[in-house]
Regions:
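FKBP-type peptidyl-prolyl cis-trans isomerase
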Residues: 101-104
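Helix-coil boundary and N-terminal low-complexity module in membrane systems
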Residues: 1-25, 42-50
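Hydrophobic alpha-helical transmembrane segments in multi-pass membrane proteins
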Residues: 18-30, 71, 75, 79, ...
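Membrane-helix interface segments in multi-pass membrane proteins
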Residues: 25-76
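Short, acidic, Ser/Thr-enriched surface-loop or helix-capping motifs
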Residues: 106-108
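Proline-rich intrinsically disordered, low-complexity coils
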Residues: 24, 46, 50-52, 95, ...
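Juxtamembrane cytosolic face of transmembrane helices
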Residues: 2-12, 18, 82-97, 111-160
């Protein structure tokens, strides 16, 4: 008998994976902030706020937002490689799913390719656009416990 993973198990796995991804990212940001002298920049502003008309303030602002943009790109690429890499591996699961004995398959129960896992990852963005989390809630109410991104990618999340 096939045991589909429902909404709550999948939510816990998602939270675990979010923690696994976020902690190193936060540590990296803090290290970069402290070692590049970026924290000292804010101490040099009167009242801790930059002067909007000052050229140095503008340059710092551009550099700051450029760094944020680079970090955002790296975060997306890192998350994509994390999810698609683990879900297409012999584990068939991210570490968060593995802890809960969950795994990702195609509709026949076979492991997924890196391409399908990539499609599933980016289909989650579509799922996130649906108001009230309905795209995710589908995992609790559909027969095969599929969220919208699972339907788009033709995948299942099963329990061992």
């Amino acid at each position: 008998m096939v045991a589909y993973a429902g909404f709550w198990l999948r939510l816990v796995a998602h939270l675990l994976d979010g923690f696994i991804i976020s902690v190193p990212a936060i540590i990296l940001v803090v290290i970069i902030f402290l070692t590049t002298g970026a924290s000292a920049v804010f101490k040099n502003f009167p009242d801790g706020h930059p002067d909007p008309g000052d050229a140095a303030s503008e340059a710092i602002g551009i550099a700051f937002f450029s760094a944020i943009a680079v970090f955002a790109v790296l975060a997306v690429v890192g998350s994509w490689l994390y999810y698609a890499g683990f879900e297409s591996s012999s584990w068939q699961a991210t570490p968060g799913k593995k802890v809960l004995n969950l795994y990702v398959t195609d509709l026949t129960g076979a492991g997924v390719s890196f391409g399908r896992a990539t499609g599933r990852f980016f289909a989650k963005w579509v799922t996130q656009l649906i108001p009230l989390g309905i795209g995710y809630i589908l995992a609790g109410i559909t027969e095969r416990k599929q969220a919208l991104h699972d339907m788009i990618a033709s995948t299942l999340v099963l329990r061992r």
